[in-house]
C-alpha cells in the first residue's frame, strides 16, 4: 500500500461522499478510489436531479460532493445552483472529461454562490489528487 493511501485511510474513515455523474464507469472508479482512501460512506447518483433526491434522503449532509459538469437532465451548473438553494455546506469537487472552459464557468458559479470549492479536475483524476482534495476538508 502506498504512503498516500495508508496515511489517508484513517483520516477519511468518517467522511461521507456523494458522487454525481452520469457515467457508470466514473461512478465505479471514483467509488473504488474513495474506498482505497478509507472512505466507506459513499453514495452515488446518475444526474443532478437524482443527486438532489439522494441529498434529502441522507441522514446528514455529505462532507464532499464529487460532481460531473456535463450530465443529462440536470447538469453540474444547475445542480450547483440547487445546492446553494438547499444550503449545502460541504466541499465540492468538480470533474469533467470534456470542455475545460465549462468547468471553469461552473467553478465560478459555485464560488459566486458561496459554495465551498475544493477543486476542479479533468478525468481521470489521479488518486493522489483526490486524496489531497479530501485532506483539505480537515
Which role does the model predict for each range below?
Residues 22, 44-53, 76:
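Helix N-cap/capping motif at the beta->alpha junctions
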Residues 59-66, 93:
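Active-site beta3 strand of CheY-like receiver
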Residues 24-43:
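Two-component/phosphorelay signaling modules centered on CheY-like receiver
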Residues 21, 68:
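Active-site residues of response regulator receiver
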Residues 78, 85, 89, 98-120:
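Alpha4 helix (beta4-alpha4-beta5 surface) of REC/receiver domains from two-component response regulators
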Residues 1-18, 31, 116, 126-138:
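Non-catalytic signal-transmission and effector/linker regions of two-component phosphorelay proteins
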Residues 123:
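A Lys-centered signature of the CheY-like receiver
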Residues 71:
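Receiver (REC) domain active-site loop signature in two-component systems and cognate sites
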Amino acid at each position: 500500500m502506498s504512503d498516500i493511501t495508508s496515511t489517508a485511510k484513517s483520516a477519511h474513515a468518517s467522511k461521507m461522499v456523494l458522487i454525481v455523474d452520469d457515467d457508470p464507469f466514473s461512478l465505479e472508479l471514483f467509488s473504488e478510489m474513495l474506498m482505497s482512501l478509507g472512505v466507506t460512506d459513499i453514495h452515488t447518483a446518475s444526474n443532478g436531479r437524482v443527486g438532489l433526491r439522494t441529498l434529502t434522503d441522507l441522514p446528514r449532509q455529505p462532507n464532499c460532493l464529487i460532481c460531473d459538469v456535463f450530465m443529462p437532465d440536470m447538469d453540474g451548473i444547475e445542480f450547483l445552483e440547487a445546492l446553494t438553494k438547499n444550503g449545502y455546506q460541504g466541499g465540492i469537487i468538480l470533474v469533467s472529461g470534456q470542455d475545460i472552459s465549462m468547468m471553469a464557468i461552473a467553478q465560478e458559479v459555485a464560488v459566486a454562490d458561496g459554495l465551498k470549492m475544493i477543486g476542479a479536475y479533468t478525468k481521470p483524476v489521479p488518486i493522489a489528487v483526490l486524496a489531497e482534495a479530501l485532506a483539505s476538508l480537515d
